[in-house]
Amino acid sequence: LGLAIGPLSWPQKNLSQASDKLPDADSVYSGSYSKAQIQDLISYANLHQITIIPEIDIPGHSRALMKALPDSFHEAGDNSEYAGYGNNSIPVCEFNSDSALGQKFTADLTNILTQTAQLFNQQTTLYAVNNELSIGGDEVFKGTWDDAPSCQTAPWNKMTSLQKEHYFLDTLNNNPPINQLKLSGWHEFVLTHDGQINSKHSIKPNETGHVWVWGKSSEVQSKAVTLANNDYPVILEYADYSYFDMTYTPQLKEPGFYWASKLGDTDASLSIAIAATNTQHQSNKPDNIIGLEGALWTDVIPDYTQLQYMALPKLAGLAEASWSAESVTDIGGKPNWQSLSYRLGCGKEGFLAYLNSVYQANYRGYPNGIEQEAPMLCNTANSVNP
């Protein structure tokens, strides 16, 4: 969920947003959350044991920062091209430099990160980490900063793009007052391309809030194991199971993506329980794998109705995988779908019927809701027992 935050030191620089459709080149966006509104969100979250982890995406995925404060976050002479585009990554080689850009970049980045973390510090939930801030850290592509003037001298000119990221983040993390924060991010912010810890410049486990492991489970499970074995607090976010923007079916009119899986349904989100168990069994320190997470990227969700449709009932499958015992979710190494489906959809008695009656949620059965699909014979002899 992206929020434009107003009460930082640059209220006049808030990015705009004003379209209830998918953004395009002509979209205009506006508005921001005040400090009071953010405190209201935190109070509500505390009451319901929901932890909010703020995020400022760096050093890649930073186009919003670069557009809002170009004098601080854009190096004019950097014509690097990467992943088919440029203008997406902040000038990391200028951090702590004496140049005019370096001084503005260092000061403004430090203030933005610190003030954002402080805004969300009043959390009292079970899993809240004081001073935690996610910096993302993912998808810094080959070629990033290759043509940046500030990166043409030592030590930067001998580094790959990912090495530059790690060197920058390590320096940032040791820089007061950032060294008082707990930085979190995707696995790339501490791992090399071959899935190893960058021993020279990775942020240390005891200085890290969380590390999210994302991607197809078959490709990134070993990375989760490496992180856990090295004492990092690991969250599994396997895209083939818990990316809720994956399509339910491969039908032409079905919304969603299929790069990670051609079937991202509720059974898939339940199945992450099996993948998580396998990951823990491969680790020498399974207790460092501390949770599962689902993702729904709202930049491709045009309205709240479709958000409900993509998240529900997948979210129930993820909750079952996350919070139920292995004896409930696992039958012979396969997900216990029958148990979950019985409790999800039993006509007017199941969890989905409850959602429909209380929230009028627009979930599976788009656009008419689960009433079109819920089994009406749950309490007969033909029903499946949990």
Predicted regions and their residues:
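An acidic- and aromatic-residue-enriched active-site/binding cleft used to recognize and process polar
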Residues: 6, 50, 55-61, 137-140, ...
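Soluble non-cytosolic domains of exported or imported proteins
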Residues: 32, 36, 100-103, 107, ...
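Flexible glycine/acidic-rich beta-alpha junction loops that bind and position SAM and/or redox cofactors
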Residues: 62-63, 143-144, 244-246
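Feature activates predominantly on carbohydrate-active enzymes
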Residues: 1-110, 114-120, 127-130
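Flexible, acidic glycine-rich loops studded with aromatic residues
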Residues: 183-386
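Anion (oxyanion) recognition and catalysis
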Residues: 39, 46, 173, 177, ...
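Active-site neighborhood of glycoside hydrolase catalytic domains
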Residues: 70, 81, 87-208, 214-226
